[in-house]
């Protein structure tokens, strides 16, 4: 997780969804 993602709202949402998807299984 780089600081670059923080500056990109869309990328941040995608990253959050990606992490959430892994957590769910």
From Swiss-Prot:
One of its GO terms (molecular function) is aspartic-type endopeptidase activity. Expressed in chorionic epithelium (trophectoderm). N-glycosylated. The keyword Hydrolase applies. Its EC number is 3.4.23.-. It is found in: Secreted, Extracellular space. One of its GO terms (cellular component) is extracellular region. Glycans are attached at residues 4, 21. This is Pregnancy-associated glycoprotein 72. Belongs to the peptidase A1 family. Keywords: Aspartyl protease, Glycoprotein, Hydrolase, Protease, Secreted. One of its GO terms (biological process) is proteolysis. The keyword Transmembrane helix does not apply. Coiled coil: none annotated.
């Amino acid at each position: 997780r780089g600081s670059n993602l923080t500056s990109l709202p869309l990328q941040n949402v995608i990253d959050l969804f990606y992490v959430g998807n892994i957590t769910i299984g």
